[in-house]
Amino acid sequence: MIFTRIKLVNLYAFCNAELNLSYPKKQVNIPLEGEHLAGRPKFYYKKVCIITGGNASGKTSLGRILCGIQIFLRTKELRSSLRLNHKDQDASFEVDFATENFLHHRLYVRFAANETGTLSVKEVKYGYVKININDTCFKTTEKLNKLFSVGVPTPAEYYFHEISSDCNAVTLEPFKNVIFSGGWYYQLSGTQESTTEISRMNKDILERVIRTFDSSIVGVVEMTESESEDKNPSRVYLIRFKNKDYSIVTSKGDITNSERMSRGTYDAVTIAHFVSAIISDCEELSVRSDIPSMTYYLDEKLAYSHSELERIIV
């Protein structure tokens, strides 16, 4: 799915915030090509977004919210990553997103937290409109506005609205039948530093990235390890330094002899995994006729690198 608009109320420090991720018209003199929905050349959206801001400005929180929204779309369940700011007030999110089957969706969810912090849905609105061959994102957004205002869909549209009462809770039954394809990969900063379990690491990408950060690294050797007799061997990566030192990146993402690395090089392992995931997904999905949209979110892993290196990686 491709996010085109996000509105947040009472989530983390977002009291009433809205983010537009679409273009009203084709942009000129931009470094990226193809910032439009495949098959809909006038439906422009921002393919890559670089979010900047000071400490505690909401960058990590935004990633957690987006991840929580995508999990809700997949499982129809609210997760703890959607944290309320004022616990005694309802929170809500409203997202517009496009999918590869040429539909522009809108989802509105209002929810609350009880004394134990458990989240419960109070109201749900969901609908979609068709994206015609020459439609812009602005045009279909106007269609969504009308659909949600009137609540009466045309034969080519869909609309669902459910609200809880004192007697009845929100069941989400019609919405549970709506299935969304696509996936996501969020690498978010936390209070405890950790690396992600490696599943699609590419040895060549790992070597190119970390040697960019640390010139004392001479190479990377891919090896295998057998965790148990009934499991297939897992990949590990031996990082070799000029002075004969070495570090090992395990299949769980742990790094031995990590003190040998600078903080920037340590984080570069995560960056390599992130880039590997994007390239691997592109290669795997390129052979499909119905290519699903994927979301990738990298949080602060370039904070300890030189600005020139940061630009090269991006």
Predicted regions and their residues:
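Phosphate-coordinating catalytic segments in nucleotide- and nucleic-acid-processing enzymes
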Residues: 2-12, 16, 20, 72-282
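Switch/communication elements of ASCE P-loop NTPase nucleotide-binding domains
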Residues: 1-75, 247-314
